[in-house]
């Protein structure tokens, strides 16, 4: 944290602009061709690995970037979370056709809901057709013609004869596209601080994929046949087809929404856990950079105070299988940049614990869903210290008033089992070691909750 915060003092006090990939773990960590060993039968319903799990991503001067595909939708792999700031271009896997423009999936597979193929970004590669990613000996069933050095737009003239160029995807591809927009902005106005750059990216961003929560987002296998605005049953650990909304995130609820879609907060900003504030318009961003040059009073200082956390709750015993109010936090009359929560627990199943926050203005944000990769037996966590989460969904709101922090807790006795089926999902379940033997109450569990508002 100290090193990342120290970046604010560089570039003659204007701060380094740090653009960072969100991650490629929507469905899984360590994905193999058609399987995942990480997030069980609900993989594909929501992000397997929260982008906020990387503590660097909680720092406001880190511009966390998601990936978009050629359809204008979230790339199948792009990690989600409430710390996303912006979305760049990442594409899919480009594994078929001359240039990756085709899908190698059959019509039947596509009809089943399979996805994860299609165009991607092109970049340079190690020279020669025997080194790097672009290779003449690549498997033609999994590699497009350009990547093998044999594609031709003009008969007899190969496009990539020396395999000097390759396809590139992932949020590692999306982040450089945002860096390119930033470079254009700084070329137009080198005096911009890191906060100016981040603000202009938000101001120039456009909403994409409106209503995405009403469809499915599958990967290479049809993980889910229910839309993302469905209900998650916290007792059965199952996704239900009924449409949900944020009002169902309330104390005592046993069913909660999986995804809230694009929300408009009290400051009038639109935000999404899939896209952050959206996709920036490079031309508009440059126009704004020039406006900041013409009107320097718009500029924000590169320095930003990060307050200490405030204790919110110190609980003995924990209730699973429902939504509970963990505690409240009193905000002062500041303008919110990011709201953060920090958790410390013992004898408590982190994979069964989700966190939601409600601002004094009534905006709600899902900071973490239960049944994520921490529920998997290979990554099960029952004791944790200083586990941090954050959200930009409240950005620009007045912090004055009472903030509510909710636990969204699933059934720890119905966690996903390790992958075992040869031809599909394993439906077996495991029990978290700290789960109560029966009922929903874990009297031995402890949970300390802290919160803070990082102001603009």
Per-region residue spans from a language model:
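Solvent-exposed, polar/charged alpha-helical surfaces in well-ordered, non-transmembrane soluble domains
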Residues: 4, 8, 176-183, 195, ...
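Substrate-binding/access-modulating region of protease and related hydrolase catalytic domains
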Residues: 1-59, 71-73, 158-177, 188, ...
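C-terminal subdomain of the subtilisin-like protease fold in secreted/lumenal serine endopeptidases
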Residues: 1, 15, 61-62, 152-168, ...
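Residue-level detector of buried hydrophobic side-chain packing
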Residues: 6, 65, 86, 172, ...
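Loop and turn regions of beta-sandwich accessory domains that flank beta-strands and are enriched
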Residues: 290-456
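Active-site-proximal beta-strand/loop segments in catalytic clefts of secreted hydrolases
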Residues: 20-25, 65-70, 80-81, 88-91, ...
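Extracellular S/T/G-rich loop segment that most often corresponds to the catalytic His/Ser-adjacent loop
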Residues: 45-183, 273
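Loop/turn elements at helix/coil->beta-strand transitions in domains of secreted/extracellular proteins
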Residues: 9-18, 59-64, 82-84, 193-194, ...
């Amino acid at each position: 944290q100290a090193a990342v915060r120290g970046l604010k003092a560089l570039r003659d006090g204007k701060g380094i602009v740090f653009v960072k990939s969100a991650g490629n773990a929507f469905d899984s960590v360590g994905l193999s061709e058609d399987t995942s060993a990480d997030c069980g039968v609900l993989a594909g319903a929501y992000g397997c690995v929260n982008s906020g799990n990387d503590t660097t991503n909680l720092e406001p001067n880190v511009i966390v970037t998601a990936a978009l595909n050629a359809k204008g939708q979230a790339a199948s792999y792009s990690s989600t979370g409430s710390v996303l700031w912006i979305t760049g271009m990442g594409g899919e896997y480009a594994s078929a056709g001359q240039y990756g423009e085709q899908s190698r999936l059959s019509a039947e597979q596509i009809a089943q809901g399979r996805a994860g193929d299609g165009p991607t970004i092109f970049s340079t590669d190690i020279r020669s057709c025997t080194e790097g990613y672009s290779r003449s000996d690549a498997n033609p069933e999994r590699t497009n013609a350009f990547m093998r050095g044999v594609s031709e737009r003009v008969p007899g003239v190969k496009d990539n004869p020396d395999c000097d160029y390759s396809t590139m995807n992932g949020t590692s591809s999306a982040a450089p596209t945002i860096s390119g927009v930033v470079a254009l902005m700084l070329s137009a106005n080198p005096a911009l601080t890191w906060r100016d750059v981040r603000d202009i990216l938000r101001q120039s961003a456009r909403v994409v994929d409106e209503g995405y929560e009403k469809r499915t987002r599958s990967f290479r296998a049809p993980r889910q046949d229910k839309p993302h605005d469905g209900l998650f049953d916290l007792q059965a650990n199952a996704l239900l087809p009924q449409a949900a909304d944020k009002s169902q995130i309330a104390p005592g609820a046993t069913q909660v929404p999986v995804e809230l879609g694009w929300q408009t907060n009290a400051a009038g900003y639109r935000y999404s856990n899939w896209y952050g504030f959206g996709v920036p318009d490079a031309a508009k961003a440059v126009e704004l950079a020039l406006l900041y040059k013409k009107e320097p009073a718009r500029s924000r200082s590169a320095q930003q105070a990060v307050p200490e956390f405030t204790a919110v709750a110190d609980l003995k015993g924990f209730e699973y299988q429902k939504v509970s109010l963990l505690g409240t936090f009193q905000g002062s009359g500041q303008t919110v940049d990011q709201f953060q929560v920090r958790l410390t627990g013992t004898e408590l199943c982190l994979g069964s614990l989700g966190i939601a926050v409600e601002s004094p203005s009534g905006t709600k944000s899902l900071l973490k869903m239960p049944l994520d990769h921490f529920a998997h037996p290979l990554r099960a966590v029952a004791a944790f210290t200083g586990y941090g989460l954050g959200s930009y969904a409240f950005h620009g709101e007045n912090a004055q008033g009472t903030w509510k922090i909710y636990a969204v807790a699933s059934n720890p006795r119905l966690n996903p089992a390790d992958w075992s089926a040869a031809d599909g999902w394993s439906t077996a379940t495991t029990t978290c070691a700290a789960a109560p033997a029966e009922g929903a109450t874990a009297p031995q569990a402890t949970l300390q909750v802290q919160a803070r508002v990082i102001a603009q």
